[in-house]
Structures are given as C-alpha cells and as structure tokens.
Amino acid sequence: MKKRYESLDVLRGLTVAFMCIVNNPGSWAHIFPPLKHAAWVGCTPTDLVYPFFVFCMGCAMAFSFSKYEKATSKAYLKVLKRGALIFLVGFALNLYPFFPTSVHDQTWTFGQNYLYWLQHKRIFGVLQRIGMAYAIAGCLALWLKKPGRILAAIGTICVAYTGILLIFGRDPGAFTLEGNVSMRIDTWLVGGDHCYHGFGGTNFDPEGVLGSLPAACSCLLGYLIGFMIHGSQKNMSALCQGSSHEGSMPSEAVNYSPDRVVNRTFIYGCLSLILGIVLSIWIPICKPLWSVSYVFYAGGWAMLTLAFLAYLLDVKGYEKPIVPFKAMGMNALMAFVFSGVIAKSYGFFGFAPARYFGANEYLSLLWSLIFASVIFAILWVLYKKKIVIKL
C-alpha cells in the first residue's frame, strides 16, 4: 500500500464518524441542537460535515494528481469518469432497494406502480454533488496547475455564482428558499418530481446543479492545502537525500518541516474563516445554497482541524489514540455507501429505531453511536486486511 498522509485520513475518519452520528438518530423528533442542520441560514457543527468531506477529497486530489507531469486527455477522462462513477453510485443509493416499498395505488398493476415510483425518484444527492464537484475541481486543477491560478479560479467562480443568484433571484430575496434561482434551474433540468421536497414541500434541491460550482471551490481549497503539504514533503525528502551525502541537513529544511506546514495550514485556515465571516455580512452563511461565505467559513474550519491533527500526529507523534479514525478515513466514500444501504434496509427486518430509541434525545444519540460503531466495525475489518475500496 502506498504512503498516505495520515492526518488527512484521520480528518476524513472523524468526518465519517460524525456523519454516521448526525444522519442516523434514533428519532428525528429528538435530536440535540448541535446535531441538527441549521434551518436555512447559519452553521451548526452538523453543517460542517459535508464541506469537510469535500475539502478532504480536494486535499487527496493534490496527492493523486502529483503523478501527472502535464494535463493529458487521458488524465481529464479519468477525472470525468471517476466523477461520473461517484454520481452513479449516489443515484443507485437513491434507487435502493430498486423497487417500491409501498404501493401508490392498489388498483394499479405492479408495472404501473413501479413506473410511478421511478417517475418520482430523486436524481441528486450527497454523492451526486461530490461527483460533480470532483469533476469540476479536478479538471480545473489539471488545467490551471499553479496555486495562484487555482486561487483566481476560486474567486472567479465565487463571484460568478453570487452574481447569478443576485441577478436571477426573485422576491423575497436571492438568498431565500422561495426566491433563489437554483430551485428553478433544477426544476427545469430534471422536473420537480425528481427534486428533493424536504424544504416545505418545495422543489428546492440542496444538492442541485448550480450549487455544485461553489462546492467545487470547497474542493479546490482542499487541493491548495494538499498541494502545499505534498510540495513540502517532496522538498523535505529531496533535502534529506542530499544531506545523507553531505553529512548535514541544509538550513532551508526548516521551511518544509512538519511544524512549519502546520503553521501555514493554521494561518490559511484563520484567513479563510475570517473571510467567510466578513462575507456573511452581505452574503448569508447558507449550507443549502452553498453560499460563498459558507465556502470560506467551512473551509477555514477544515484547515484549522487538519492543522490540529497534523500537529498531534506529525509534530507530537500521537498516533495510537486516533488509529480508529484513520481506519474510517481510508474508506470514507464506502463508509457513506455502507451507512446508506444499512439505514435503508431496516424495513426488511421489521426494525424501526424510533420504536426503541425514540423516547428522548439521549436514547436517540445512543442509537447514533451504535450505528456508527457498526460502520466502524466494517471499516476496521477492511483496514486490518489493508483493503482500500476506491471509486
């Protein structure tokens, strides 16, 4: 198995563990406030799970793209194929168990009920947006290469996205549920029946097409941090090899040391967080819209968390206490797939968590922890067998 950046695996593992907890309560009626999403504007710890996942994907992208000396059609095709595969896996999760679990009309034939079921299945979803963001960010990273150009692309996309929301938004406001243009675009593209209906019965889909543009920016923020970390590791390795011949470590090695990398990641995280807060004066922090302020606010927290983990692992050498999260992070995408399949399979066994764990918030959280432990057990087996499943 090739060398991995362990701090990134641990961050992904923490994200996956928290995802399992917040997505699988014993009862949706009994959840502690920090484990709920903000209704529309605002950001709870739960609202950081998704952008952390996307940020980690971008960071890992920087390591995997280091093998491309130049952007070729083969490289672009590989990125697009992986993005499409992630999208299709997400859509397959929407379809699972691939047949209607209830009958819409008793007078209809099975074929009529099945067709109705297909006509009302949601197209988009979490993995679908991850796939779209990966494809956009990956192609831009291959094309632009240099961090300065990528940073300029992030700024351009953010300005363009906000401009689209403002120009085509309607009353009561461009950043509101009722007035945002994203809902109209998704309804036009796939039809209202194929959109999410969890926001007051509207057709607004929080994982729709337009919002995948700023999500790609979150991915590119991760790419920039990953690019910086990988470059530091590469330069340090080269200096170490040179010092083995000369007998002493060059003075410039301090620029690529783990603590210097931690400091830079921390500073970038603070700057991104501050930028997100400042932008929120005019553009609300809104996860459903993946607003520009949300991009930098969540990205800042992701950088700060990665800096903290890198400090523990790379500077202080604390590894054993966080090995379980490393195991979860090495198969992060599969953890999402496993959790989705298991949660949608309760009905096959006549099991309803709310029946046993739905009386209060404490029991509801207990079930979340049990569920997360089951996912961890599956991923631990894969980790011990050195199996990494990639899409």
Over which residues does each language-model region extend?
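Alpha-helical transmembrane segments and their immediate juxtamembrane cytosolic regions
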Residues: M1-A238, S243-H245, P250, N255-L391
